[in-house]
């Protein structure tokens, strides 16, 4: 699966550390059972039942770690039922994108249980925006299926660890706890044992897994968490995460053993993103000669068909898409990469800063988003996106991350590949 760059999340986490003291941090606790997972456990114990588990998160969830390991645990613990995963993990993405894609990527497949993992990638985000996005995920989920149980899980990085070492949750997880408290959603802090080992000097945050006797001896009794301090090794750090979930399951099972219909009439924040929608870009007006890509036959578009509902390939300067929406927020879900060009953005007749669709990490193509406007006045807005002919010094762009142009022909084009519009509100025909 193609991933958004998870390094962006790491940078956001570092930026967010300075603001920890400005936000009240929740006490760190491995499990808060709250309303439990009653419907999930009842179905898991039913002979012949088909149980679907959704995993919505970032690159830590995308790894073959806690997601794969917990699914294996459920299969072993409840052999009378069958289990299938809905893998909705995209590296480098937070709840701000998750709230727009949860319907398409998870809810459309009818999950019985939804794990939500965004604490790391939301590390530098504003707490109130986290609350609005997480609440939007909850409300959309229960609107689609009131019997779907939800569990928040909080992962950790070296950069986000200082509060945990002092017995507090990081800022992003503390914000998420407000949503969990309000809706009675259980939460599991996956990094409690990680923090315990780190505080005792028995954790190597960033190192390769030892292979030789000399490497093992050099580590002593330290457990190697990750190669980069962020993405746990599947056989070490991810196992600690899985063990935290397994330890927490009994508490979640006894919290509530009655079938439950989840309701969400009252809102924690009236400005939550329950109205967030992922709209195929083909719903927009395309300029003359511009046509949607065939998501089944077009080699490039097909590679993104699991995440993007459509694609329009703007390859000539002057090609454009236009649309109107009624609401308060608009962004674009697209593919950036070596072939990325410059895009002119016009909102309500006013030119915005042009958006460059290649960055320092674009030695390969990946999913991305860019903002058109947010916190807009409730009402109708008009958007125009046009591909520009403006040249880009791509060598200089790549050099910012010590990358280089390998094959000039890969970087020569100046293209734009939008797939969806992210709207809080409604598209206006």
Predicted region positions:
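Solvent-exposed loop/turn segments at secondary-structure junctions
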Residues: 59-62, 90-95, 120-125, 148, ...
């Amino acid at each position: 699966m193609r991933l958004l760059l998870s390094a962006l999340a790491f940078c956001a986490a570092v930026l967010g550390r300075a603001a920890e003291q400005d936000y009240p941090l929740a006490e760190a606790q491995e499990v808060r059972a709250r309303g439990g997972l009653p419907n999930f456990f009842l179905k898991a114990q039913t002979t012949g039942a088909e149980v679907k588990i959704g995993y919505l998160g970032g690159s830590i969830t995308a790894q073959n770690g806690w997601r794969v390991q917990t699914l294996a645990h459920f299969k072993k613990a409840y052999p009378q039922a069958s289990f299938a995963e809905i893998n909705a993990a995209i590296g480098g993405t937070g709840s701000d994108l998750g709230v727009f894609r949860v319907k398409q990527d998870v809810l459309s497949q009818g999950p019985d249980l939804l794990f939500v993992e965004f604490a790391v990638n939301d590390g530098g985000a504003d707490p109130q925006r986290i609350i609005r996005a997480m609440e939007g995920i909850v409300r959309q989920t229960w609107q689609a299926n009131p019997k779907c149980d939800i569990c928040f899980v909080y992962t950790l990085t070296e950069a986000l660890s200082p509060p945990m070492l002092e017995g507090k949750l990081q800022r992003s997880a503390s914000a998420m706890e407000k949503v969990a408290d309000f809706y009675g959603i259980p939460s599991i802090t996956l990094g409690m044992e990680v923090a315990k080992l780190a505080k005792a000097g028995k954790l190597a945050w960033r190192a390769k897994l030892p292979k030789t006797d000399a490497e093992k001896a050099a580590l002593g009794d330290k457990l190697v968490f990750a190669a980069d301090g962020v993405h746990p090794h599947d056989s070490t750090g991810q196992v600690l995460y899985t063990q935290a979930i397994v330890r927490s399951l009994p508490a979640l099972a006894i919290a509530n053993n009655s079938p439950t219909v989840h309701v969400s009439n009252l809102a924690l924040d009236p400005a939550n993103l329950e109205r967030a929608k992922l709209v195929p870009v083909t719903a927009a007006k395309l300029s003359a000669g511009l046509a949607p890509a065939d998501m089944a036959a077009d080699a490039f578009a097909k590679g993104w068909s699991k995440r993007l509902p459509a694609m329009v390939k703007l390859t000539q300067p002057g090609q454009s898409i236009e649309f109107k929406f009624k609401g308060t927020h608009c962004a674009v879900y697209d593919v950036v990469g070596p072939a990325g060009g410059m895009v002119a953005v016009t909102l309500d007749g006013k030119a915005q800063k042009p958006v460059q669709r290649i960055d320092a990490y674009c030695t390969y193509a990946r999913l991305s988003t860019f903002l058109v406007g947010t916190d807009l006045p409730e009402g109708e807005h008009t958007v125009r996106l046009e591909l520009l002919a403006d040249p880009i010094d791509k060598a200089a762009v790549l050099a910012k991350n010590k990358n280089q142009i390998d094959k000039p022909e890969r970087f020569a084009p100046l293209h734009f590949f939008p797939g969806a519009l992210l709207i809080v509100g409604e598209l206006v025909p």
